């Protein structure tokens, strides 16, 4: 077993004693849970569509290996390199999103994927974490240079990304991106009057989505009135939780995976509820809650606004996505095809999440021994007071 002493000055040694090992452990545990649940849920799906039983399992493992490398590699980066990589990555994501609209693969009326040698690549997944860091950079730079139009530029970038997502269309991803943007603007100290205006615009956007996108209207209608349309998938998901009880039917003994086409993706939480039971399902909820809250508590002691905004944006993205997926599975929210982070099948999602959490691990690493230094934005960083308090109540 490799051990690192506190005096070890190697790159890995310094990383080991400064990274949040609890957050890292929860990330790895959640990935492991995902592989186990995909092994339980996907063979029935693969058999139903004529593929080898472990087709989806092996493909997920194929993506898991680079995801682990990315997670560890990104967590080694200094703050300035997180920003640089995210800026380049976000600009590339925008180009790929435009390419998706032109030459992408269309499924169920949505054009969200690009085919790379038999692998479907979803650029919007990679836009989410890089967007959070990109806008955090612009908003924090406004503090270092008061004349810099950080609010305006961040808003323009958000609107461009939202526009590209709506053209696919992908209303769920749009909701996640918009929530990240609003959260970051709020943390950056935007006036409350502007927050009220954004809330009104958001409400108008929700009404517009209902009016303009028939599939959105149908899902909301079915959520409010189950007799207004087909609710087979949600009903099957609810029955799965009922069948599972407290301790589940046992691994491999569930039924819901044999009747739902996306049991290995959007409804993998229902598979967990049926085969592992309520207690295991609550443990999965606890994993996500711990992951988000642990990092947020760590950010309370942070003095670099860029770190707070970037990490906070990524955590909001992951937390909201988990809430939406699990909420849909138990019919607390209208149906929406959104994967459960680190657990559902999906290569693009897994790699993008590894990038995002790698960024968070890098940004939240302890930087001991520095009393007063300049950050990459030119701000003066001190060990105290906490970041949110130092922003004059911006949070």
Give residue ranges: language-model regions.
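Short, Lys/Arg-rich, polar N-terminal cytosolic tail immediately upstream
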Residues: 1-17
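Glycine/serine-rich anion-binding loops at beta->alpha junctions
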Residues: 117-127, 167-169, 245, 249, ...
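Long extracytoplasmic/lumenal interhelical loops at the membrane interface
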Residues: 245-279
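Transmembrane alpha-helices of multi-pass inner-membrane enzymes
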Residues: 32, 331-374
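Short acidic (Asp/Glu) and glycine-rich catalytic loops that position anionic groups and cofactors
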Residues: 5, 216-217, 248-251, 292
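Hydrophobic alpha-helical transmembrane segments of multi-pass inner membrane proteins, especially
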Residues: 24-40, 46-233, 270-328, 355-359, ...
């Amino acid at each position: 077993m490799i051990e690192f002493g506190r005096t070890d000055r190697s790159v890995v040694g310094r990383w080991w004693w400064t990274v949040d090992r609890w957050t890292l452990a929860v990330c790895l545990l959640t990935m492991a849970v995902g592989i186990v649940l995909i092994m339980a849920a996907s063979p029935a799906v693969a058999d139903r569509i004529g593929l080898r039983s472990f087709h989806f399992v092996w493909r997920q493992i194929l993506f898991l290996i680079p995801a682990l490398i990315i997670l560890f590699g990104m967590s080694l980066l200094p703050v300035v390199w997180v920003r640089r990589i995210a800026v380049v990555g976000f600009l590339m994501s925008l180009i790929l999103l435009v390419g998706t609209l032109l030459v992408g693969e269309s499924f169920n009326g949505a054009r969200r994927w690009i085919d790379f040698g038999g692998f479907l690549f979803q650029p919007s997944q990679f836009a989410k974490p890089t967007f959070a860091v990109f806008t955090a950079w612009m908003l924090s730079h406004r503090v270092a240079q008061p004349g810099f139009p950080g609010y305006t530029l961040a808003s323009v970038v958000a609107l461009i990304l939202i526009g590209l997502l709506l053209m696919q269309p992908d209303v769920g991803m749009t909701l996640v991106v918009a929530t990240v943007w609003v959260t970051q603007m709020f943390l950056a100290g935007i006036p409350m009057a502007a927050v009220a205006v954004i809330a009104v615009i958001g409400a108008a956007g929700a009404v517009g989505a209902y009016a303009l996108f028939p599939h959105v209207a149908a899902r909301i209608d079915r959520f409010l009135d189950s007799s207004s349309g087909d609710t087979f998938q949600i009903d099957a998901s609810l029955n799965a939780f009922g069948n599972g009880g407290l301790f589940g039917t046992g691994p491999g003994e569930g039924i819901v995976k044999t009747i739902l086409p996306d049991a290995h993706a959007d409804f993998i939480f229902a598979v967990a509820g049926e085969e592992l039971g309520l207690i295991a399902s609550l443990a999965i909820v606890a994993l996500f809650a711990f992951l988000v809250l642990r990092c947020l508590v760590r950010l309370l002691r942070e003095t670099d606004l860029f770190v707070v905004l970037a990490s906070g944006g990524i955590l909001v993205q992951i937390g909201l996505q988990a809430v939406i997926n699990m909420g849909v599975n138990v019919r607390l929210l209208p149906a929406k095809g959104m994967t459960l982070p680190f657990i559902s099948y999906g290569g693009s999602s897994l790699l993008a999440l590894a990038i995002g959490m790698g960024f968070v691990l890098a940004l939240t690493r302890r930087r001991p021994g520095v009393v007063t230094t300049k950050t990459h934005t030119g701000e003066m960083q001190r060990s105290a007071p906490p970041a949110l308090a130092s922003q004059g109540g911006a949070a």
